[in-house]
């Protein structure tokens, strides 16, 4: 009678044997070694013998033109910003808000002690 760990190891060995017959149609990863599909190997210009020895997939695909174009499309380009202009707009908005203090929805509360809530309790 086989134990559960022995059965699982046997199952894994059978699966690996099945994958070995068809290894270029299956992508698998073991100890950070990449087994790439045959089509990916052709794209990268890598010999099929070298596929199992790759340590990083990024190394092979890093410098292709397609990847550079894709990076350029995804890169966000920001305009130059004039900080003085933005500060002037912010101060103008603040001035507009302070001029209209009676129409604002916020209530103003005086600083200092609150006489209503700080009353002495008569029977404490």
Curated annotation (Swiss-Prot):
The keyword Coiled coil applies. GO terms for cellular component: apoplast. Keywords: Auxin signaling pathway, Coiled coil, Developmental protein, Differentiation, Glycoprotein, Secreted, Signal. It comes from the Eukaryota. InterPro entries: CLE45-like. Glycans are attached at residues 25, 96. GO terms for biological process: auxin-activated signaling pathway; cell-cell signaling involved in cell fate commitment; maintenance of root meristem identity; phloem development; regulation of auxin mediated signaling pathway; regulation of cell differentiation; regulation of pollen tube growth; response to temperature stimulus. Residues 87-103 have a biased composition (Basic and acidic residues). Residues 1-20 form the signal peptide. PANTHER family: CLAVATA3/ESR (CLE)-RELATED PROTEIN 45, CLAVATA3_ESR (CLE)-RELATED PROTEIN 45. Belongs to the CLV3/ESR signal peptide family. This is CLAVATA3/ESR (CLE)-related protein 45.
């Amino acid at each position: 009678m086989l134990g559960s760990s022995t059965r699982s190891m046997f199952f894994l060995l059978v699966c690996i044997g099945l994958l070995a017959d068809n290894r270029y149609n299956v992508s698998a990863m073991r100890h950070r070694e990449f087994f790439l599909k045959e089509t990916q190997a052709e794209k990268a210009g890598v010999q099929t013998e070298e596929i199992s020895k790759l340590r990083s997939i990024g190394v092979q695909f890093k410098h292709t033109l397609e990847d550079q174009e894709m990076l350029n499309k995804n890169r966000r380009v920001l305009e130059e910003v004039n900080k003085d202009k933005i500060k002037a707009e912010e101060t103008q908005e603040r001035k507009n808000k302070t001029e209209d203090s009676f129409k604002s929805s916020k209530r103003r509360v005086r600083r200092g002690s609150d006489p209503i809530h700080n009353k002495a309790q008569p029977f404490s």
